[in-house]
UniProtKB/Swiss-Prot annotation:
UniProtKB keywords: Host-virus interaction, Inhibition of host innate immune response by virus, Viral immunoevasion
Species this chain originates from: Bacillus phage SPbeta
Phenotype when changing H17E: Complete loss of the ability to inactivate the host DSR2 NADase activity
Protein name in the entry: DSR anti-defense 1
Consequence recorded when altering F59E: Complete loss of the ability to inactivate the host DSR2 NADase activity
GO biological process, one term: symbiont-mediated suppression of host innate immune response
Binding partners and assembly: Interacts with Bacillus subtilis DSR2 (via C-terminus) in a 2:4 ratio; this interaction leads to the absence of activation of the NADase defense activity of DSR2.
Family recorded in the similarity comment: Belongs to the DSR anti-defense 1 family.
UniProt keyword annotation of Transmembrane present: no
Reported function: Counteracts the defense-associated sirtuin 2 (DSR2) defense system of the host. Inhibits the NADase activity of host DSR2 by competing with the tail tube protein that normally activates DSR2.
Result of changing N21E: Complete loss of the ability to inactivate the host DSR2 NADase activity
Site entry: Interaction with host DSR2: F59
């Protein structure tokens, strides 16, 4: 069963991307897709700019990495980072709860919480 939760206030809907055989959140930024075929994980792209080369450096990290990094930043009361774009596929509501927790604390307008695809 597939459930799609849509944020009615969002400007974009969740769309199906046939190239990676999964759903993606079509945000206003450039979409960077993971090459992974694993549908039981989330893959986020976080804006990262270590050397200020060409204004920014985008890279993809796994859900485990982004959640661990997010928790570390929350503990240190550091909220100055943004999740700029994402591919979000979940088989567990635990993932949604973590994303919800982070989105409540991160100073980012990225509306990911209501955009979840459950594949189980």
């Amino acid at each position: 069963m597939i459930e799609i939760f849509k944020d009615t206030g969002a400007t974009h809907d969740l769309v199906y991307h046939s190239k990676i055989n999964t759903f993606v959140w079509d945000v206003e930024f450039d979409i960077v897709l993971s090459d992974s075929k694993e549908l039981n994980k989330c893959y986020f792209v976080k804006c990262f700019n270590p050397y200020r080369i060409n204004g920014k450096c985008d890279f993809a990290v796994s859900s485990i990495d982004i959640f661990s990094e997010g928790k570390r930043l929350l503990i240190e009361n550091e909220f100055n980072f943004k999740i700029t774009k994402a591919v979000h596929v979940a088989t567990s509501k635990d993932v949604t709860e973590i994303v919800l927790h982070l989105s409540e604390r991160i100073s980012s307008p990225f509306p990911i919480v209501k955009e979840v695809v459950y594949l189980d």
